[in-house]
Regions:
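Alpha/beta enzyme core
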Residues: 1-19, 25-40, 49-160, 164, ...
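Short, conserved loop-to-beta-strand elements that form functional interface hotspots
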Residues: 46
Length: 175
């Protein structure tokens, strides 16, 4: 069975850190319908690290969680430079409080660090910032993270859940 699902604007390529109003409206409409007909937790992810839209949609639609790509890291990729949003998102969450979990990527796929920072520092920053879970991904969609990367993240997470964000399929799930 499935424990939870995430709804993304996966087809809105090329991704940007902001989207057109019509995309937000359509996303909200679709998410609302899915939430009304779902018995599992549902989350919101608006590509790419569009955290203000994610929080607004999650808040309005009673989502269970949001995925935050760059909570405590500054990264670069095809979407340009993406700046850490943790402090601003936490202020937004404080202004519009709701019990919505923050599931945050560590070294999010399709990007690389602008300035190198140790993994333990990144994870500690995400935890201290208020994340409810961490996401471990491979280098791109469909690519699994290494077992060593997952084990290291689990070790450093200090009990915070670690979720695999890419590459899980019938061939890799046993690992």
């Amino acid at each position: 069975g499935v424990d939870a699902a995430i709804v993304e604007n996966f087809g809105d390529v090329p991704y940007s850190t902001s989207n057109e109003l019509v995309s937000y409206t359509a996303f909200t409409n679709i998410f609302t319908r899915l939430k009304e007909n779902s018995s599992i937790p549902l989350g919101v992810n608006v590509q790419f690290n569009d955290f203000k839209a994610e929080w607004a949609i999650a808040y309005a639609c009673n989502a269970d969680f949001i995925r935050v790509e760059c909570f405590a890291e500054n990264r670069m990729g095809p979407n340009g430079i993406v700046v850490s949003c943790g402090p601003e998102l936490m202020r937004l969450k404080g202004k519009y409080p709701k019990d919505i979990c923050l599931i945050c990527d560590v070294h999010v796929k399709h990007t690389f660090e602008i300035v190198s920072q140790p993994l333990d520092f990144t994870i500690e920053s995400i935890k201290e910032g208020g994340a409810d879970a961490l996401i471990c991904t491979g280098i791109s969609t469909g690519k699994s993270p290494s077992i060593e990367d997952v084990e290291k993240m689990k070790e450093l997470s200090d009990g915070l859940p670690v979720i695999l964000g890419s590459g899980v399929n019938s061939n890799t799930v046993k690992d």
